[in-house]
Structure formats: structure tokens, C-alpha cells
Amino acid sequence: MAATMQALLVIALLHLATATPVVTKHKVSTFSTGFLGHPVGGLGYGGLGYGGLGYGGLGVAGLGYGGLGYPGAALGGAYTHHAALGGLGYPLGIGAGVVAPHVVNSKIAAPLAPVVAAI
């Protein structure tokens, strides 16, 4: 768990170091309302949003709401998603009939249910 958190923090720092501020009404790549959004498919509301990328069947996207959002991935019919509300977010996984929401409200969340999809 500690190694996972450390890896996520490194990813967040790399994103902060490389993200490009985008403030535009262009909705194809970035939806912007007074925030910093990654120029590739980023969303954010008062926070930092990670970009959406596609890799041959693997789709990733991210959301940030006043915190750091980590990517969600669609893998073989299973869907996982990460959201952050004032903190670091863990996966919101939907797959094989199992819903596992992991949401943060100004703190770090622990898993609420098993996540089916591999991350």
C-alpha cells in the first residue's frame, strides 16, 4: 500500500511538472472553467485534471475537483475510475456486477469494496 501511494505521488508530481495550463472553451481536448487542465482530454473544477489517453483498447481519463485526480481505465469490459474531492482519490470500480466506490473528501480513502479490474 505504501509503495502504491508513493508511486501515485510521483505520478502526481510528474504531472504537476509537465502539465500545461489550458483556459479555453474548446471541448474536444479540455473542458476549462478557471482551472488547470491537462491539454489532452483533461477535466477539472478548481483542481488539476489528468488527461484522457487511448492505447488500443485501453482508455484512461482523469478528473480533479479541488484536488488531484488519478486515471480511470477501461480494461476488458471492466471499468475503474479515480476521483478526488479535496484530496487523493482511490478507484471507483464497476465490473462484473461489483461496484467499489473509493472517494476522498479532504482525506485519504481506504477501499470500500473489492475492485474487480486490474489497475
Swiss-Prot record:
Coiled coil: none annotated. Keywords: Extracellular matrix, Repeat, Secreted, Signal. The keyword Secreted applies. Pfam families: Lamprin (PF06403). GO terms for molecular function: structural molecule activity. Sequence repeats lie at residues 41-45, 46-50, 51-55, 56-60, 61-65, 66-70, 86-90. It is found in: Secreted, Extracellular space, Extracellular matrix. It comes from the Eukaryota. One of its GO terms (cellular component) is extracellular region. Residues 41-90 are annotated as: 7 X 5 AA approximate repeats. Residues 1-19 form the signal peptide. The polymeric lamprin chains self-aggregate to form fibers and have secondary structures particularly rich in beta-sheets and in beta-turns. Self-aggregating protein that is part of the soluble form of lamprin. This is Lamprin 1.8-10. It comes from Petromyzon marinus (Sea lamprey).
